[in-house]
Amino acid sequence: MSKALASPAKRFFVEMLTRDIELADAILDLLDNCVDGAIRVGPKDAALPYKGFHAHIELTPSAFKIDDNCGGIPRNIAENYAFRFGRTERDRDANLATVGVYGIGMKRAIFKLGTNCVLESKHAADQFTVTIDKAWMENDGPDGWELEL
């Protein structure tokens, strides 16, 4: 039996994902992720659960940078979940009061902000870098949705 290709064209998918979000809201999605990361790390002080955490934003005409200390992305989450579009694990974080709901905020923000992104994550003793650039966007081949860590 033959098969028909039914995967989305990447450019179409990205345009649909970002068409209804303003740039400021995309940045707020990234800050939501910082808040969720701090929640996952756990409060150091129950009365002030975000004490000691920060998210610094740097914006220039040619670049946007957010630097935080909110826990990073665990490698297994990056490999299997964080860069997927939408939640695959509905019960993940069910016991936490996280802000994120749909699993698209970071990706939508990255695509809204521009065509070149370098994401560096440090979680516990592990760290990795992910690059999403024009070459990745233009690759609609069978492995086109994969990202190198």
Specify the residue positions occupied by each region the protein language model found.
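Bergerat-fold GHKL ATPase/HATPase_c domain
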Residues: 1-52, 76-79, 83
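Glycine-rich/acidic phosphate-handling loop/turn and adjacent ATP-lid/helix
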Residues: 64-95, 137
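Short helix/loop capping segments that flank catalytic or ligand/cofactor-binding pockets
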Residues: 39, 74-76, 122, 128
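Glycine-rich, histidine-containing beta strand-loop boundary motifs that form or position
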Residues: 30, 68-70, 77, 120-123
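Alpha-helix N-cap/helix-initiation motif
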Residues: 16-23, 67, 71, 91-102
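Conserved, well-folded catalytic cores of nucleic-acid-processing
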Residues: 20, 33-37, 85-89, 112, ...
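Short beta-strand/loop element within the Bergerat-fold HATPase_c
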Residues: 49-61
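GHKL-type ATPase core
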Residues: 93-149
